[in-house]
C-alpha cells in the first residue's frame, strides 16, 4: 500500500519534504514528514501549511508548531503512518488525557475507546482531567469517570461551577427522605422501594415537612418549628440547636421592599450583608459552634420554611413572621451555583406545562437533577396518605408511590446502607 511506502520513507528520508519542529514548555522535537500525508490526515496542518506558504517569503520546508505536548503530538503524527505506534514514557492515565488534549488541538476527534484506559486516575491527575472535560464539552463517559475517581476529601472549590453542575446532572438521584413513625429519619430508594438508611433521632420531630438536603453529600437539616437538627448521614450523627438565643438582631430597614427581596432570594445574598456586619460587632458574644447572626422582621407571614444558604454554611428559617440566619461552623462550607430560570441560565430548555393533569390537591413540587420531576398531593382531606408521582421533564409519568408521611428528595446524598 502507498501508506506503507510513506512509512518506510520516514526513516529513509528520501521523499520527505517538510521538517516540523514540535515545541512545548519542556522540550523540542524535529520530525521529517510528507506534506501530502499530514495534510490529508490532519486539517490543522493543512491550514497551517497553507497559511505559512501565503505569508512567508522564505522556503516553506521547515515549520515550528507550539503544541500542548510535543512527545504525544509526535506519536499522533506517527499514527498517520502506523496505527500501532504508541509512547510509553508516561503512565497510561496521563498519556490518555494528554492525547485527548493534543488531538483536540490538532482538530482531530478522539477515539472513545481510549476512555476505557481511564479506569483509575490518581489525585494528582484530577486537574488535568478537569482540563480535558472542559474541551470535550463534558463528555458523558468522562463525567462518569470523574465521579468514580474524585475523592471524598477533594476541595471542590478548585472545580469550576459548570463542571459541578454537570456532575450533579449525572447523579442518579434515587433517594427520598422522610420522617418515620418512631421519630426516625428514613432514606428510601425509590427504584427498589427499599429502606437504605434509618437514623434514630433523640429529639422529637414527628411528621415535620421541614427537611432539606445539603449539596455537600452528607448533611440533612430538619426543623419542627422550635428546634432544628443537622444530621450527618455518613456518620449517623445528629446535633441540635433551639431557635431561642440571647443574640438577636433586627434589621434597621424594615421596609416591605427588603422583606419581599429576602423572601424571594431565601436570604442567599441579602442576609450575607447583614451577617458580615453582625459578626464584626458581636464576635465576642458568638457561640462556639453556632451563631444566630441576624433577624429580619417581615410585615406578613412568608410561610414556614428552612433552607441552606447559597454557600451552605448557614441555615435560613422563618418563625413568627421573622426570617433568621444561623451560621453553621460545625460543617464544611461548600460553594454552589444559583440558577435563574427566567433568564435561562445553564441551558434551561424545558418550560412545559402539565395542563392536562389535575393538581387540585398538590402540596409539594420538587425536582431531581436528572430531568425528573416529583410532585405530591393528598388523596383527600380525610385521608392522611400522600401520593407522590415521578414524571420525566417532558411530562411522561414514570412512577407513583404512596407514603403515610411527607417526603423530600435527597438529590445529592450518597447511597448509604444500614449498618
Curated annotation (Swiss-Prot):
Residues 263-290 have a biased composition (Basic and acidic residues). Residues 250-290 are annotated as: Disordered. Residues 16-89 form the BTB domain. It holds the Pfam family BTB. Belongs to the mimivirus BTB/WD family. This is Putative BTB/POZ domain-containing protein L85. It comes from Acanthamoeba polyphaga mimivirus.
Amino acid at each position: 500500500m502507498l501508506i506503507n511506502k510513506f512509512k518506510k520513507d520516514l526513516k529513509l528520508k528520501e521523499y520527505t519534504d517538510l521538517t516540523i519542529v514540535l515545541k512545548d514548555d519542556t522540550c523540542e522535537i524535529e520530525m521529517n514528514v510528507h506534506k501530502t500525508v499530514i495534510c490529508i490526515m490532519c486539517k490543522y496542518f493543512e491550514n497551517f501549511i497553507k497559511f505559512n506558504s501565503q505569508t512567508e517569503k522564505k522556503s516553506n520546508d521547515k515549520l515550528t508548531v507550539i503544541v500542548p505536548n510535543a512527545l504525544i503530538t509526535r506519536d499522533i503524527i506517527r499514527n498517520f503512518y502506523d496505527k500501532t505506534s504508541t509512547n510509553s514514557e508516561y503512565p497510561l492515565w496521563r498519556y490518555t488525557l494528554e492525547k485527548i488534549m493534543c488531538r483536540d488541538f490538532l482538530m482531530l476527534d478522539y477515539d472513545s475507546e481510549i476512555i476505557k484506559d481511564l479506569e483509575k486516575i490518581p489525585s494528582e491527575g484530577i486537574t488535568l482531567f478537569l482540563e480535558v472535560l472542559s474541551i470535550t464539552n463534558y463528555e458523558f463517559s468522562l463525567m462518569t469517570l470523574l465521579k468514580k475517581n474524585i475523592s471524598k476529601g477533594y476541595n471542590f472549590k478548585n472545580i469550576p461551577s459548570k463542571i459541578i453542575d454537570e456532575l450533579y446532572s449525572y447523579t442518579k438521584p434515587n433517594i427520598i427522605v422522610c420522617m418515620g413513625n418512631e421519630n426516625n429519619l428514613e432514606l428510601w430508594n425509590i427504584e427498589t422501594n427499599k429502606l437504605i438508611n434509618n437514623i434514630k433521632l433523640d429529639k422529637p420531630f414527628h411528621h415535620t415537612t421541614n427537611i432539606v438536603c445539603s449539596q455537600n453529600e452528607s448533611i440533612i437539616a430538619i426543623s419542627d418549628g422550635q428546634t432544628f437538627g443537622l444530621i450527618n448521614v455518613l456518620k449517623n450523627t445528629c446535633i441540635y440547636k433551639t431557635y431561642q438565643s440571647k443574640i438577636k438582631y433586627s434589621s434597621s430597614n424594615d421596609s416591605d421592599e427588603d422583606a419581599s427581596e429576602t423572601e424571594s432570594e431565601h436570604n442567599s445574598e441579602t442576609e450575607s450583608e447583614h451577617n458580615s456586619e453582625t459578626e464584626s460587632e458581636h464576635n465576642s458574644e458568638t457561640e462556639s459552634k453556632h451563631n444566630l447572626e441576624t433577624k429580619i422582621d417581615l410585615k406578613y407571614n412568608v410561610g414556614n420554611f428552612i433552607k441552606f444558604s447559597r454557600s451552605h454554611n448557614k441555615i435560613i428559617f422563618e418563625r413568627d413572621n421573622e426570617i433568621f440566619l444561623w451560621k453553621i461552623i460545625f460543617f464544611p462550607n461548600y460553594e454552589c451555583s444559583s440558577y435563574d430560570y427566567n433568564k435561562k441560565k445553564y441551558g434551561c430548555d424545558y418550560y412545559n406545562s402539565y395542563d392536562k393533569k389535575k393538581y387540585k390537591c398538590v402540596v409539594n413540587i420538587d425536582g431531581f437533577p436528572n430531568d425528573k420531576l416529583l410532585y405530591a398531593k393528598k388523596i383527600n382531606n380525610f385521608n392522611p396518605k400522600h401520593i407522590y408521582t415521578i414524571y420525566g421533564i417532558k411530562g411522561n409519568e414514570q412512577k407513583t408511590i404512596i407514603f403515610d408521611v411527607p417526603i423530600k428528595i435527597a438529590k445529592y446524598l450518597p447511597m448509604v446502607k444500614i449498618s
